[in-house]
Swiss-Prot record:
InterPro entries: Aminotrans_II_pyridoxalP_BS (IPR001917), Aminotransferase_I/II_large (IPR004839), AON_synthase_class-II (IPR050087), AONS_Archaea/Proteobacteria (IPR004723), AONS_Proteobacteria (IPR022834), PyrdxlP-dep_Trfase (IPR015424), PyrdxlP-dep_Trfase_major (IPR015421), PyrdxlP-dep_Trfase_small (IPR015422). The gene is bioF. Its EC number is 2.3.1.47. HAMAP family: BioF_aminotrans_2. Gene3D superfamilies: Aspartate Aminotransferase, domain 1, Type I PLP-dependent aspartate aminotransferase-like (Major domain). Its cofactor is pyridoxal 5'-phosphate. GO terms for biological process: biotin biosynthetic process. It comes from the Bacteria. The modification N6-(pyridoxal phosphate)lysine is found at K237. This is 8-amino-7-oxononanoate synthase. Belongs to the class-II pyridoxal-phosphate-dependent aminotransferase family. BioF subfamily. GO terms for molecular function: 8-amino-7-oxononanoate synthase activity; pyridoxal phosphate binding. Substrate binds at R18, H130, T353. Keywords: Biotin biosynthesis, Pyridoxal phosphate, Transferase.
Length: 393
């Protein structure tokens, strides 16, 4: 049996060792990283709301009125007025009867999936779904059937083969796939769930606030808002705050209150976070929010086109998440370091986050990037790619 130290050395030798960098000050398009200003190209703060004055003001007012902490789990004494106000806001935003907030996206997915599925049930999960979906499915003890990425023919065959099951059939997918930036085939998934009597759950962590005419997410973009049974999303990405949610029928939300262990056994979100999240939804619903979405879309297109013109494989990206394929772990991390030398901070993505041989730079655009920022980033990536001999992968 290897010691912990030996396992860590194995990770270092394979180019898979991870460590944390220090970010000073606010999250914006430029940050102070380990004491140096850099252009940020790997944040999920897509609309730039994490340091928005309206969110900060809402958080400060909430602390002054409600204090810092919530004190307990919501089923004990930690259920506050702001929890209800935020959940009502989310339900209205998503067009559902009710909503429930969780402490993180990971807690939401593990809690929801392990609550709604169990022994005798079937979970159909896209192979590129987020790790929190994978872990939630494993915790549920249901039978998990993974289908090839966005392969609706394969999914139909699997549903047909398991049509006679007496348990629940649940289709779970990312709305936007977090490492490739492409979209789920939500219209086809909705049709399949209706044909086979399944439930459809969509993790829209990277679509909420960003996609669709009103920022409702990938389901709005695909025209299936009312055909998704459980909308899951996060408050800490485009919305600039913290936490996550499920939006669904009142029956499903009541069920989660009674069965989702990550909700039941967690101290509830604090007032500042709740108030900032409410302010974020208000902003997303405003003309200012529409302008931010428009700016983000323009930046994403400009960046993706620039990388592709430089010969990079952007792996089918359709969103603000734009990968630049590299291949090996060591090469990818060297690429990331060389970019940092030029003042561009973008993380290399390695196994187990992505399969062996598919390492990439996961670049993420923000509405607050200028055109000059975008062009500078493209130029730096193209330059380093040529020097390392990975352009055109």
């Amino acid at each position: 049996m290897q010691t912990f130290g030996e396992e860590l050395e194995s990770l270092r030798a394979a180019g898979l060792f991870r460590s944390m960098r220090l970010v000073e000050g606010e999250q914006s398009s430029r940050i102070i990283l380990d004491g140096r200003e850099v252009l940020l190209l790997c944040s999920n703060n897509y609309l730039g709301l994490a340091d928005h004055p309206l969110l900060k003001e809402a958080a400060i007012r909430a602390v002054e009125r409600f204090g810092v902490g919530s004190g307990a789990a919501r089923l004990v004494s930690g259920n506050m007025e702001l929890h209800f106000r935020l959940e009502e806001r989310i339900a209205a935003f998503k067009g559902t009867e009710a909503a429930l907030v969780f402490n993180s996206g990971y807690a939401a997915n593990t809690g929801i999936i392990s609550a709604i599925a169990g022994r005798g049930d079937l979970i159909f999960s896209d192979r590129l779904n987020h790790a929190s979906i994978v872990d939630g499915a494993l915790l549920s003890r249901a039978k998990v059937i993974r289908y090839s990425h966005n392969d609706m023919v394969a999914l139909r065959r699997l549903l047909e083969e398991n049509r006679s099951t007496s348990g629940r059939r649940i289709i779970v997918t990312d709305g936007v796939f977090s490492m490739d930036g492409d979209l789920a085939e939500l219209a086809e998934l909705a049709a399949l769930k209706e044909e086979f009597g399944a439930l459809l759950m969509v993790d829209d962590a990277h679509g909420t606030g960003v996609l669709g005419e009103h920022g409702r997410g990938s389901a709005e973009l695909c025209g299936v808002m009312d055909r998704v049974d459980i909308h899951m999303g996060t408050l800490g990405k485009a919305l600039g705050s913290f936490g996550a949610y499920a939006a669904a029928s009142k029956e499903i939300i009541d069920y989660l209150v009674n069965r989702a262990r990550s909700f039941i056994f967690s101290t509830s979100l604090p007032p500042a976070v709740l108030a900032a999240s409410i302010a974020a939804f208000d902003l997303v619903d405003s003309q200012a929010g529409a302008d931010l979405r428009k700016g983000l879309a323009a930046n994403s297109t400009r960046f993706k086109d620039g990388l592709e013109n430089a010969g990079f494989n952007t792996m089918g990206s359709e969103t603000q998440i734009v990968p630049a394929f590299v291949g090996g772990a060591a090469e990818t991390m060297k690429f990331s370091r060389k970019l940092l030398d030029q003042g561009i901070f973008v993380q290399g993505i390695r196994p187990p986050t992505v399969p062996v041989g598919s390492c990439r730079l996961r670049c993420t655009l923000m509405a607050t990037h200028s055109q000059a920022d975008v062009d500078r980033a493209v130029s730096a990536i193209a330059h380093v790619g040529r020097k390392l001999g990975v352009t055109g992968c």
